[in-house]
């Protein structure tokens, strides 16, 4: 049994484009009992939430009481070439605008609590989460998994470097690189990365972590304390696929979101020894 229900939602952006999404809701969500919202951004970027995957499972978060928004912004597949072209080479523009537009539409619903929201994504979705962090403080927390951070550094180090050089010129990369906005970040972030990730090398996560602690608006204090968190898997790849590690992944995400969005503590996995 699913712990909730699934709805199709959509909005129309300023350029007249329709942005579709799925919204997974707990059964108890209502105008009398609005629920927190988790915006979950898919990877790819040439991808879609139309395909089911056990690894990126919204129902686990719905079971914890969140509504989970699964949007298909510009660059998503299944909506024609023009929809892809809207975001081609401009990752931080149309895709970001689409994500904010569909979020605006959903938080206007009476069954959603617009004061308790978070954003999350992996790979390209993590890139977008990083971009969101540097462009808005509307979310209480952001989770970024296996994410692109400094695009000038990423391009020549990924195992898909040949593809990347066809996707973006050096100038495009710098125009769309999240690391240039680190000084604007005032939202607590959970950074997750696997050391054996060759698609988005670990250097992206390490640099993001260092720059959050040194240059964001929530830097580490004299004792090294900061609301930002880093979950590191020394023997995992781009997805984090070992079942015990996938379990830890979800438990740490739940802990971080509960603290930052819901305002209470959930225990961390015993395996972390914390």
What is the predicted function of each stretch?
Residues 7, 19, 37, 64-66, ...:
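Structural beta-strand/beta-sheet cores of well-ordered domains, especially the beta-sheet scaffolds
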Residues 29-35, 40-80:
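Short substrate-entry loop that stabilizes the transition state in hydrolases
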Residues 9-11, 41, 71, 233:
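Hydrophobic residues at beta-strand termini and immediately following loops
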Residues 18, 34-35, 186, 227:
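A structure-centric signal for secondary-structure junctions around beta-strands
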Residues 3, 33, 53, 94, ...:
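Short secondary-structure boundary/capping elements
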Residues 70-274:
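Active-site-proximal cap/loop segments of hydrolase catalytic domains
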Residues 1-33, 56-58, 63-64, 105, ...:
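Non-catalytic accessory segments flanking enzyme active sites
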Residues 24, 40-41, 120, 192:
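Short hydrophobic segments within beta-strands
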């Amino acid at each position: 049994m699913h712990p909730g229900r699934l709805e199709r939602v959509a909005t129309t952006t300023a350029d007249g484009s329709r942005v579709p999404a799925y919204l997974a809701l707990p059964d108890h969500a209502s105008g009398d009992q609005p629920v927190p919202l988790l915006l979950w951004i898919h990877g790819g970027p040439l991808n879609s939430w139309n395909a089911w995957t056990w690894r990126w499972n919204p129902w686990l978060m719905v079971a914890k009481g969140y509504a989970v928004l699964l949007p298909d912004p510009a660059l998503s597949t299944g909506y024609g070439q023009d929809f892809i072209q809207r975001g081609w080479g401009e990752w931080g523009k149309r895709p970001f605008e689409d994500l904010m537009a569909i979020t605006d539409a959903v938080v206007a619903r009476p069954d959603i609590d617009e004061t308790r929201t978070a954003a999350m994504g992996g790979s390209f979705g993590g890139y977008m989460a990083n971009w969101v962090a540097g462009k808005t403080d509307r979310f209480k927390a952001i989770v970024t998994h296996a994410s692109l951070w400094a695009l000038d550094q990423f391009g020549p180090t990924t195992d898909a470097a040949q593809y990347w050089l066809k996707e973006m010129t050096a100038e495009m990369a710098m125009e769309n690189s999240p690391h240039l906005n680190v000084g604007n970040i005032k939202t607590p972030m959970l950074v997750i990365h696997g050391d054996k990730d060759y698609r988005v090398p670990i250097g992206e996560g390490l640099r993001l972590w260092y720059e959050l602690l040194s240059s964001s608006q929530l830097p580490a204090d004299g004792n090294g304390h900061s609301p930002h968190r880093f979950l590191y898997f020394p023997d995992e790849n781009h997805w984090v696929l070992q079942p015990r590690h996938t379990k830890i992944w979800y438990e740490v995400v739940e802990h971080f979101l509960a603290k930052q969005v819901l305002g209470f503590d959930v225990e961390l996995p015993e395996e972390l020894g914390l």
